[in-house]
Amino acid sequence: MSLEPFSKSEALTFGVELELQLVNRHDYDLASASPDLLRMLKGKEYPGDIKPEITDSMIEISTGICHSHDEALWQLREMRDRMAEAATALNIGICGGGTHPFQQWSQRQISQSPRYQYISDLYGYLAKQFTVFGQHVHIGCPNPDDALYLLHAMSRYVPHFIALAASSPFVQGVDTGFASARMNSVSAFPMSGRAPFVLTWDAFIAYFDKMHATGVIESMKDFYWDIRPKPEFGTIEVRVMDTPLTVERAAAIAAYIQALGRWLLLDRPFMPVEDDYLVYTFNRFQACRFGLAGEYVDPATGNRGALADHILETSKLLSAHAEALSSEGALDMVREVVEARDADAEWIRAAQRETRNLHETVRRGCGRWTQAATQPA
């Protein structure tokens, strides 16, 4: 099949997807509960969409097309609250976090959709190991060439997104030492990593056609890039974030990405070059391993400094754009997280140090996810 045309979308509109954990209330291990939860939600009114994911222990919520931080936050809260009501009736818990701290991948059940069965047949045990939980943010682009510009310009800031959302320090009962261990599961897939450096849609079509001719890929869904174009939506999709522990933080990170996109598209502060990617894997690793305590090499200057400082410096450049988007509060939340080094991975580790029990840590995570909307993130 050929690459579908790039659809028209309103520039800088955005959408948020969150993959969530479903756990039992006995020992807070993952539960194969998505079919039952979806049945409970059938006929209920809520914005956005709620649908199954690759294994039955996961569920995905996604907003509609949003113009503002407040709109996205309202939609996420509404879906969270409807799901919490259904989960209570089923006696299951729902929580955020990029990995479940102690689940065993071999116990997972692949969802029945043909797409997920195909992935399981193709990738074997990697499909079950892909029971990890991410936040994706779509940004509307006025045309396909602008989408590719934004994709590559925004790639410099991938470490920001990883560190701000990092919430997966534990895997199979072990503290990995990573702030975002989830990304290691994604990296195992052959079509993961960064998108090829092409800046025109014609060149991207030529790349896609070559890849399709080899039989390696069938559609854009087969690319697991950190940021990828989504021509059917007229967006780029940022895919590197762990699912935060609250919808408030998820919405703030999405608004940060929207403001960054506005700055990049309107001001065009630099033109991406292929050498930007010389330090890409180093910066990405630093964010995954150390989170907000990581280092960052500026691709433009080669200067090495603190990732947290680079996020704060960037946030100053975004202030006017956040004001134009009515998302100043979200940008302030991002700054507060960075200044306090208050990533969710640190909350999870602190809960584990206090309880010395990962089951109790997950229980507390469920409470954090379903907290009243008036509570801070």
From Swiss-Prot:
tRNA processing keyword on record: no
Alphabetic keyword roster = ATP-binding, Ligase, Nucleotide-binding
In Gene Ontology terms, what is a biological process of this protein?
modified amino acid biosynthetic process
Q: Where does the secretion signal sit in this chain?
A: none
User: EC top class, in one word?
Assistant: ligase
What are this entry's molecular-function GO terms?
ATP binding; glutamate-cysteine ligase activity
Reaction(s) catalysed by this chain, per the record, are:
L-cysteine + L-glutamate + ATP = gamma-L-glutamyl-L-cysteine + ADP + phosphate + H(+)
Q: Which Enzyme Commission numbers does its entry carry?
A: 6.3.2.2
Does the entry feature the keyword Nucleotide-binding, yes or no? yes
Query: One Pfam family this chain carries?
Result: GCS2
Please list the disulfide bridges.
none
Q: Which family does it belong to?
A: Belongs to the glutamate--cysteine ligase type 2 family. YbdK subfamily.
- Role according to the record: ATP-dependent carboxylate-amine ligase which exhibits weak glutamate--cysteine ligase activity.
**Identification of the protein by name:** Putative glutamate--cysteine ligase 2
Q: Which organism is it from?
A: Ralstonia pickettii (strain 12J)
Q: What is the lineage of its organism?
A: Bacteria, Pseudomonadati, Pseudomonadota, Betaproteobacteria, Burkholderiales
